[in-house]
Amino acid sequence: MFIRIFAPKLIILMKPLILISNDDGYQAKGINCLIKMVREYGDIIVCAPDSARSGYACAFSATTPLRLTLQHKEEGLEVWSSNGTPVDCIKLALSELCPRKPDLVIGGINHGDNASVNTHYSGTMGVTMEGCMKYINSVAFSLCDYRADADFSPLEPYIRQIVQRVLNEGLPKGVCLNVNFPLIEEKEYRGVRLCRMAYGTWGSEVAKCHHPRGYDYYWMMGHYTNDEPEREDTDNWALNHGYVAITPTRMDVTAYEAFEALKQYEL
């Protein structure tokens, strides 16, 4: 796959430039499987956290000096790590590593789903939203499996197809894709569905513990409840019924449908 760049009396064919990051760290199995899956589609620059940064969403480092460390380099592939957040990694890569504007930003493959309200907490989606805010075609991939040795091989044909399509056709301005995969055997996949985010809530989120030295401390945990389990148009329903869930996600979070109901707020 090549991109044509036109100049006076000159046509230059260039491979697409793909920027990849995650929130599980550059050594995670998911991101390394992703690199292999999309390697043939362009030149790859990876800039990912030096360790796990799950739950960082769109956070960036305003008061911490950031570092970049080259971990691996070969023809068409560079892998960098940073002490920053997932969004820091994208900002750093766009400023310091990419020779031109990438044709695609990919977040993932995440160890664990990023469906429903998890979208708002996800560092993987932070990567994708940052790309989207820079008007770069951006996609996030996540598997409903938190294990470090998760099997990502069933995802390959779907990821390859989605990446090819986005590179060829692009996405609407201000829209990125949040793609979640169910934890099932490859033969059990039933297809792909376009979905909306399910409404869900987290409860029992804090576990209080007592330290032997006399003070209390807390672990963030929690239990997720799908508030609309029967709605077949949601990502949770699709995942629970063996479908790959694709949720088009907007950079613009304005609730346009609420304008009429809230007109009385105008002065």
Report residues per predicted region:
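Electrostatically charged, flexible surface regions
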Residues: S153-L267
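Short, Lys/Arg-enriched N-terminal segments with co-localized hydrophobic residues
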Residues: F2-L13
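Glycine/threonine-rich flexible loop motifs
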Residues: D113-S122
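A cross-family phosphate/adenosyl-ligand binding-site feature
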Residues: K15-I18, K29-E96, R100-K101
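Short acidic, Gly/Ser-rich segments with clustered Asp/Glu that frequently serve as metal-coordination loops
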Residues: D24-C33, M221
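Short, glycine-rich nucleotide/cofactor-binding loops
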Residues: I20-Q27, N118
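Glycine-rich phosphate/pyrophosphate-binding loops
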Residues: C132-P154
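Hydrophobic/aromatic ligand-binding patch that stacks against planar heteroaromatic rings
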Residues: V127-G131
